[in-house]
């Protein structure tokens, strides 16, 4: 299974922010949309990623307040990325090795979507369930 198959099932809904946006507004958007990450776009081009991890770190450093902190100050400027043709096993390994919970999927400089660790786990589980059903059907119909 490849990343593009997960994106196809997941859909291409993408919520973004700008580097000049306030972190407190990003928190509101993420809470309202039930998101763990936001893609940060600067004039339509990917500038970085913001996840709850960066927000929690900023809160810890600033005694629980974000004030007028801008996303450009806390976002990951050069996030680890995936490609649509990447195999899911390679994607899982990349996520585990880097600790990234969310990876932007890029092709030829174009952002196609974001894959979360949950998306990967769900896709792998569904693939395994399908294979199990097929094997059980095969075994059940095995000639005696």
PLM ranges: what are they?
Residues 1-12, 51-96, 117-144:
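Tandem CBS (Bateman) regulatory domains
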Residues 30-33, 38-53, 95, 103-120:
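A glycine-centered beta-loop-beta connector
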Residues 16-34, 41, 81-99, 106:
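The conserved cystathionine-beta-synthase
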Residues 24, 44, 73-74, 109, ...:
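Residue-level signal for alpha-helical context at structural boundaries
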Residues 6, 11-38, 45-46, 50-62:
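N-terminal first-folded block
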